[in-house]
């Protein structure tokens, strides 16, 4: 069995877990998340713990058990604490504004870029060059952050572009004559 899958997922107070066949629903103060569990994985619920085990002895079943455990743990953390992802805009004139569920970006193009946020994700701008994304679904937050970063990813000479706040951009040296 996978080392990750051996550890049970503890369900804190205030979180409701419902298992209906292969459909797992986790409900908490930050919302509700649903995921279909792979057929190779068996989930057991005992009081405030979820345990994951592979249905057979294959390598793929072991891998799926560990992956499923990690995803469900992220769901539980998401509905209790939530996840945040911070982006920085580096460059002259690069700005961001949030209006409702739309992030308006000025990234040096001849036109402003508007990115509509999916349901369950909120954004705020503490300053004109920072975007903070919040939500319960870890995968969705990461995808939205990657989509925004893709509009203008950091270039290797000056480092201008949209980057994650913890990202280190390695810069190249300019060509010498």
Curated annotation (Swiss-Prot):
Signal peptide region: none
Any GO BP annotation: cytoplasmic translation
GO molecular function: rRNA binding; structural constituent of ribosome
Superkingdom: Bacteria
SUPFAM superfamilies the UniProt entry points to: Ribosomal protein L6
Keyword Ribonucleoprotein: yes
Function noted in UniProt: This protein binds to the 23S rRNA, and is important in its secondary structure. It is located near the subunit interface in the base of the L7/L12 stalk, and near the tRNA binding site of the peptidyltransferase center.
Cited HAMAP family: Ribosomal_uL6_B (MF_01365_B)
Name by which UniProt lists this protein: Large ribosomal subunit protein uL6
């Amino acid at each position: 069995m996978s080392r990750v899958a051996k550890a049970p997922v503890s369900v804190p107070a205030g979180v409701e877990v419902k298992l209906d066949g292969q459909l797992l629903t986790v409900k908490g103060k930050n919302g509700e998340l649903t995921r279909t569990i792979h057929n190779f994985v068996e989930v057991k619920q005992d009081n405030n713990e979820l345990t994951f085990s592979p249905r057979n002895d294959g390598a793929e079943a072991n891998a799926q058990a560990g992956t499923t455990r990690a995803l469900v743990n992220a769901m539980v953390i998401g509905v209790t604490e939530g996840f945040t992802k911070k982006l920085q805009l580096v460059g002259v004139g690069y700005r961001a504004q949030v209006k409702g569920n739309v992030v308006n970006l000025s990234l040096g193009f001849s036109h402003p870029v508007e990115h509509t946020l999916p349901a369950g994700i909120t954004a705020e701008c503490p300053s004109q060059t920072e975007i903070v994304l919040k939500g319960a679904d870890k995968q969705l937050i990461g995808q939205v952050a990657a989509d925004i970063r893709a509009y203008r990813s950091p270039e290797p000479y000056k480092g201008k572009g949209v980057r994650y706040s913890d990202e280190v951009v390695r810069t190249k040296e300019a060509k010498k004559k």
